[in-house]
């Protein structure tokens, strides 16, 4: 393949995305009667969306199913019967289908000049792939934003990630022996996995069936018909898909559960049909390079098989599994434990199919009686210490089962009864209709119905109802369900430190933990299921050779003259500024101090702090004069956006009066504690007023001494246009006449439970060459959880213009670093985002050479030194270690680089993936470029773990999220007096602000080309 040109697209329409096989399913239970005592409930409409993987995750090969959607173990609900109904014809085995491309099914044609013909703007009709690329996108949002349509590419013109141009890198100052947490998976390429679609319907076909019922019905069919449906030969994703090593009968089955004292009679229809035959040979063809089609459906089917056994033996959280067995030191003693677990993925690699498994730790609430949990959690000696508000805050939203009935259905706590248990009465209705309703009490009902005497009568009941229907159950009859995560932010200081210690284990301990898990009976290689599918896991870690790259020479300053600094590998490539200064110190004459700690009793800003900071700035090479404005305020001011804006405007006005209209170059803000008002201050300063601010906490500043002030000075110097560190020999790959620009892009998505907030795009670009260490930033809001960057070409063009304005030269070469995309989204980056950039540039008569590199941090790959001599002083791999053999893609252009030194825990390498290269890098050249760039990060004196354009883009995207939260909070606070200001109301407000108001994210013109974000 000739570098710099696209490889020809496939004519068969096969894209690179993953097929989503999921469908319906999910859903809760809804009480038909008032349901006191946790009585039988009817099926409610499900809130969980089914569906297979749509490539929304980051990092490794995406898991096929959401483990959180797997049904719980079936409860007892009567013996039941299964009847076969009207067999349907079996679907003849089909060849493995090409999965629909992530962004490739949108149709259209390619653009003229960029790579073909003019782009086709989507019509008003919905594209079949809309749900693949837009998640929960309200139509009104797109209309209000008037968003630029996505560029579309004809299937025959689609481009794929480039192949590696050589056999990998060879340059190294030394070589080290490593182990990597990849385990080879052997399989028979002649084997097939049969994929079946499952549909389970209740008595009312339009109502969704809960996950509990899905698992219960599936298990019932299989256990009643073991010869036709062998459990050990099948794997179920808990929703719509069954994968089988043998052929299964197809058709519809009637599953009936007779009426019992606890449950009404129920019936279901279980329909199964074959949809595909997955050939493992297709995966072999792909890994050997004989086919460029990635059979993601085969990988996803194998992934479900690998997860089947641990899903039955362990606590499942998302795509991770955690042990039920804990050690004494993992119990926090207040109803919360730390559980060890793992997450694994299947990856095609150069050595074959690999199972990548990594260790993790999560805090869980213990599966125990609600009463005992409350006693432990609040440290009560008895329930007379009951405090309603505290209990509601802790319990609402948690799931429980009831222990007075055999049915172990999971129910959600929605609140507490207003009355205590002894005072609750209700109308008891005779289900047979023989007697009129009569008034009874909860206490009497449980004594007569279940023979249970209520002990704790002077506390409320739990309300387990749904859809406004109350379902009161005494707390002592409720048990917390296992696997409920306890937020680490809620842990006390000692518990948080202990959880961190368990999580950030040293490399040797992490390696032992991983080895133990891969070999465990309940691990991915345990059980008989994977063997029945012809899969076998080699339980020995993969040995691999790493190459350590030479650190670049750095340019610093000493007493006004340039000096060369050689980072010392024995000091983990770090350097210090004890007797040296920054490369180019800025001149700061007009600046201000805002002291929010003046009225604080503790953590006041020391009287000499500003003088000491000025002294440290001078020693670093900055010319820092005394502040022209010094104002004091209170921390309470930060809770009011109007007060913050008024205060900042007063700073501008005073500076202007004193120095002939000059605006303050910088505002130093002292705070005594962390406060949400920090977000509001940044939002107002950076979008409304155009002020550069530097905030700091007085406590750490006092304790940190001169080192803290030096770090603060580095940030300040970068923010006001200075240069902290540069490469002495610049970037050797490029020619003298080249003008090069680096661009970084990232998308910050809202939290999982936030269903409305926009996603925030950040695009940054360099403003100088060859130093390439000053960046401009742009912040853009786009529809909720949309990963594809809309208007990426316009953002890049705007940054190119900023580069031209700063240097007077237009870049002839651009390297784009994209963060936050998974392997399944490479198609989107290449055929939507890159094409948008090329078309936008071309319209402006601009055709630079472009290289696109993806940086992935959300993966599970870890490296471990084979001996002490192969590692650093902390037992991690040395800074500058690169791996581009065995565990990388069989032939695509990727590598792992651990550029930083891991001082705590186990170093996580960054996975770099070159998708497109018009600049013609060799493996050695691109690895050297990225490693050297990691030394130019402006905030510290050591190489960072992530290439700076991506690092900065991540910081800017997070800043955009802060803008959204701050503006939402201000919107809530401006409600009329008497409006709700509860926590729930505030949370709702934070989610309700859509992206109609683009001014929220629009940077002030004064800051568009300033590194305000560092």
Curated annotation (Swiss-Prot):
Keyword ATP-binding: no
Biased composition (Low complexity): 83-104, 121-137
TM segment ranges: none
Coiled coil: none
Alphabetical keyword list: Plant defense, Repressor, Ribonucleoprotein, RNA-binding, RNA-mediated gene silencing, Transcription, Transcription regulation, Translation regulation
Biased composition (Basic and acidic residues): 1-15
Region (Interaction with guide RNA): 857-858, 900-908, 937-959
Keyword RNA-binding: yes
Entry protein name: Protein argonaute 2
Oligomeric form and interacting partners: Interacts with NERD.
Any single GO CC term annotated in Swiss-Prot or TrEMBL for this entry: nucleus
SMART domains, alphabetized: DUF1785, PAZ, Piwi
One Gene Ontology MF term: siRNA binding
Native organism: Arabidopsis thaliana
Annotated stretches, region: Disordered: 1-137
Top-rank lineage group of the source organism: Eukaryota
């Amino acid at each position: 393949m000739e570098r710099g040109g696209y490889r020809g697209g496939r004519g068969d329409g096969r894209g690179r995305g993953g097929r989503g096989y999921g469908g319906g399913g999910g859903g809760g239970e809804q009480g038909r009667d008032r349901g006191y005592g946790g009585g039988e409930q009817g099926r409610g409409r499900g809130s969980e969306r089914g569906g297979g993987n749509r490539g929304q995750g980051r990092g490794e090969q995406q898991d096929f199913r959401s483990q959180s959607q797997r049904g719980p173990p079936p409860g007892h609900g009567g013996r039941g019967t299964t009847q076969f109904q009207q067999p349907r014809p079996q679907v003849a085995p089909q060849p493995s289908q090409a999965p629909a491309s992530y962004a490739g099914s949108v149709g259209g044609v390619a653009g003229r000049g960029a790579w073909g013909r003019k782009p086709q703007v989507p019509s008003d009709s919905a594209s079949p792939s809309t749900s693949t690329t837009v998640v929960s996108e309200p139509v009104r949002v797109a209309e209000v934003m008037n968003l630029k349509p996505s560029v579309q590419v004809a299937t025959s013109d689609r481009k794929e990630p480039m192949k590696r141009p050589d056999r990998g890198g060879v340059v190294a100052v030394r070589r080290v022996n490593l182990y990597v947490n990849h385990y080879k998976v052997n399989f028979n390429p002649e084997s097939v996995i049969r994929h079946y679609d499952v549909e389970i319907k209740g008595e009312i076909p339009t109502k969704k069936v809960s996950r509990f019922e899905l698992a219960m019905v599936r298990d019932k069919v299989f256990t009643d018909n073991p010869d036709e449906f062998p459990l050990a030969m099948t794997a179920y994703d808990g929703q719509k898909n069954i994968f089988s090593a043998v052929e299964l009968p197809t058709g519809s089955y009637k599953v009936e559960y007779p009426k019992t004292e606890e449950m009404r009679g129920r019936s279901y229809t279980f329909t199964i049909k074959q949809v595909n035959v997955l050939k493992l040979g297709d995966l072999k063809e792909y890994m050997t390079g004989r086919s460029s089609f990635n059979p993601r459906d085969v990988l996803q089917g194998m992934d479900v098989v690998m997860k089947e056994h641990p899903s039955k033996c362990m606590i499942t959280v998302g795509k991770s599994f955690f042990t039920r067995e804990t050690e004494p030191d993992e119990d926090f003693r207040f109803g919360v434990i730390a559980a060890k677990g793992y997450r694994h993925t299947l990856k095609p690699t150069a050595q074959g199919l690999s199972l990548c498994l990594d260790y993790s730790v999560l805090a869980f609430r213990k599966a125990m009686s609600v009463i005992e949990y409350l006693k432990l959690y609040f440290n009560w000696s008895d329930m007379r210490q009951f405090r309603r508000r505290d209990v509601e805050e802790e319990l609402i939203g948690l799931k429980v089962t009831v222990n007075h009935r055999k049915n172990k259905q999971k129910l959600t706590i929605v609140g507490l009864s207003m009355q205590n248990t002894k005072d609750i009465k209700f109308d008891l209705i005779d289900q047979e209709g023989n007697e009129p309703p009569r008034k009874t009490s909860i206490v009497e009902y449980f004594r007569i119905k279940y023979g249970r005497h209520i002990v704790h009568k002077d506390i409320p009941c739990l309300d387990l109802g749904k859809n406004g229907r109350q379902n009161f159950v005494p707390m002592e009859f409720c048990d917390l369900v296992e696997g409920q995560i306890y937020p680490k932010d809620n842990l006390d200081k000692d518990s948080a430190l202990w959880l961190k210690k368990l999580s950030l284990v040293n490399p040797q301990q992490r390696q032992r933990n991983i080895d133990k898990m891969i070999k465990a009976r309940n691990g991915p290689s345990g059980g008989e299921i994977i063997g029945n599918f012809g899969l076998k896991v080699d339980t020995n870690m993969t040995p691999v050779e790493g190459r350590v790259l030479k650190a670049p020479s750095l340019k610093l300053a000493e007493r006004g003259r340039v000096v060369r600094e050689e980072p010392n590998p024995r000091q983990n490539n770090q350097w210090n500024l004890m007797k040296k200064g920054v490369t180019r110190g800025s001149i700061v004459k007009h600046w201000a101090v805002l002291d929010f700690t003046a009225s604080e009793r503790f953590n006041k800003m020391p009287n000499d702090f500003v003088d000491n900071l000025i002294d440290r700035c001078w020693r670093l090479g900055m010319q820092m004069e005394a502040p022209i404005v010094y104002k004091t305020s209170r921390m309470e001011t930060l809770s009011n956006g109007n007060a913050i804006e008024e205060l900042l405007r007063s700073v501008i006005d005073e500076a202007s009066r004193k120095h002939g209209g000059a605006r303050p170059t910088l505002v130093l803000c002292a705070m005594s504690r962390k406060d949400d008002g920090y977000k509001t201050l940044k939002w107002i300063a950076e979008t409304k007023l155009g002020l550069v601010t530097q905030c700091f906490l007085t406590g750490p500043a006092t304790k940190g001494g001169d080192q803290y002030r030096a770090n603060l000075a580095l940030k300040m110097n970068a923010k006001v246009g200075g240069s902290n560190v540069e490469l002495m020999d610049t970037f050797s790959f490029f020619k003298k006449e080249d003008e090069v620009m680096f661009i970084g892009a990232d998308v910050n998505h809202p939290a999982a439970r936030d269903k409305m907030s926009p996603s925030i795009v950040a695009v940054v670009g360099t403003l100088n060459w060859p130093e390439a260490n000053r960046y401009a930033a742009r912040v853009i809001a786009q529809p909720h959880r949309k990963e594809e960057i809309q208007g990426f070409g316009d953002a890049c063009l705007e940054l190119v213009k900023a580069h031209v304005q700063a240097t007077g030269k237009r870049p002839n070469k651009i390297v784009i670093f994209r963060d936050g995309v998974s392997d399944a989204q490479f198609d989107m980056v290449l055929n939507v985002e890159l094409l948008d950039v090329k078309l936008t540039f071309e319209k402006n008569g601009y055709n630079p050479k472009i290289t696109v590199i993806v940086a992935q941090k959300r993966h599970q790959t870890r490296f471990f030194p084979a001996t002490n001599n192969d590692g650093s002083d902390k037992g991690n791999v040395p800074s500058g270690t690169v791996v581009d053999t065995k565990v990388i893609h069989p032939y695509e252009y990727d590598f792992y680089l651990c550029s930083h030194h891991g001082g705590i825990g186990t170093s996580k390498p960054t996975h770099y993936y070159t998708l497109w290269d018009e600049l013609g890098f060799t493996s050695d050249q691109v690895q050297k470029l990225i490693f050297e760039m990691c030394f130019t990060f402006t905030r510290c004196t050591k190489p960072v773990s992530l290439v700076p354009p991506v690092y900065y883009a991540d910081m800017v995207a997070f800043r955009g999220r802060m803008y959204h939260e701050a503006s939402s909070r201000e919107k809530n606070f401006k409600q009329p007096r008497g409006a709700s200001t509860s926590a729930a109301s505030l949370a709702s407000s934070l989610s309700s602000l859509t992206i109609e108001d683009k001014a929220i994210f629009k940077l002030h013109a004064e800051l568009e080309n300033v590194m305000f974000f560092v």
